[in-house]
Amino acid sequence: MEASAKLTFARLSPRKTRLVVDMVRGKGIQDALTILRFSPQASAKLVSKLLRSAVANAEQKGASDVDRLYVKSISVDGGPVLKRFVPRAMGRASKIRKPTSHITVVLADKQ
């Protein structure tokens, strides 16, 4: 049985978030949450929250044993980029890019 969860429009850089996501891909739920708990990256907190949401979704779907779940797939896609301007000297302006991410998690039972 599979359960999934999505986080959309997260104000995180997709490039930096992929570094965190790669650490937990294919791991068991307890191992993944432990890795994320001790990870210093800002995206680790949101990814662990998303994993817990996926586990809750699995329980709602009727998963018999939550401890047997593992991260089957987890992906980070780029969302829209918020563009802002900051004033600079002599009437100029510089562009500030604020990237967003879409994170998708799929959990499955170990066979």
Curated annotation (Swiss-Prot):
PROSITE patterns: RIBOSOMAL_L22. SUPFAM superfamilies: Ribosomal protein L22 (SSF54843). The keyword RNA-binding applies. One of its GO terms (molecular function) is structural constituent of ribosome. GO terms for biological process: translation. Keywords: Ribonucleoprotein, Ribosomal protein, RNA-binding, rRNA-binding. Pfam families: Ribosomal_L22. GO terms for cellular component: cytosolic large ribosomal subunit. The keyword ATP-binding does not apply. InterPro entries: Ribosomal_uL22, Ribosomal_uL22_bac/chlpt-type, Ribosomal_uL22_bac/org-type, Ribosomal_uL22_CS, Ribosomal_uL22_sf. Belongs to the universal ribosomal protein uL22 family. This protein binds specifically to 23S rRNA; its binding is stimulated by other ribosomal proteins, e.g. L4, L17, and L20. It is important during the early stages of 50S assembly. It makes multiple contacts with different domains of the 23S rRNA in the assembled 50S subunit and ribosome. The globular domain of the protein is located near the polypeptide exit tunnel on the outside of the subunit, while an extended beta-hairpin is found that lines the wall of the exit tunnel in the center of the 70S ribosome. PANTHER family: CHLOROPLAST 50S RIBOSOMAL PROTEIN L22-RELATED, LARGE RIBOSOMAL SUBUNIT PROTEIN UL22M. Part of the 50S ribosomal subunit. This is Large ribosomal subunit protein uL22. It comes from Geobacter sulfurreducens (strain ATCC 51573 / DSM 12127 / PCA). The gene is rplV.
